[in-house]
């Protein structure tokens, strides 16, 4: 399972259009999103420019591209000297402009995710207050529940960052998890509608499997003429970086262990990535319609 942040803009069970896009178009979109910040407004901008793609696909593409951007710049923002400058700048501003969205403004000025900046500033505050580096658990708890932060002004500013960041933060993590589960439920429902017997990830773990796809079919099926033993649900867009990572960390091992399978990128994928069918990995942007049981004929 994997999911994109944000709301589910399209139904999980119905295809609104073909969500495969060529690599050239993907690059055009990725160049466009370089100028955008991770705010709710950015989605309106994307939908205005790319009207043929649903919001869920655009959000997934933007989120993945923005996360790449943040990873490239993270070392610069994590420098102790830079952090001291950011923190002191925030504390000085909070003295006179406490009611303003100071951390959101600072995040925009230094080109850093609001939720990531909030985490860094909270860490600086707790380290200054307690003279020790806070644990990850303490940080996570306070980011999830800002009322736990002793400084009420800082708590308000951190909450603003969490609410307004569509790529990072505890709120986004919860939404991503929920969307991932929603699409897994849709996959199971589609299989049951076609009377296809399967074991899901939870059932496989009970049987002692550790690393498994979302679905193992008890009786293989054929999709587009290719045999499928397993299905993996990805509530995200399949770009080069994410797909290659999944190939190396998941899909090839599934193939070696269970045979050929199907990956569903519910929010679409780069069409050129569907090039491993002969090696056992088939890509789809929704539940397939061309399904044949290997022992019972076409499914109705």
From Swiss-Prot:
Its main location: nucleus. Keywords: Cytoplasm, Nucleus. GO terms for biological process: erythrocyte differentiation. GO terms for cellular component: cytoplasm; nucleus. It is found in: Nucleus; Cytoplasm. May play a role in erythroid cell differentiation. This is CDAN1-interacting nuclease 1. Disulfide bonds: none annotated. InterPro entries: CDIN1. The gene is cdin1. It comes from the Eukaryota. It holds the Pfam family TPD.
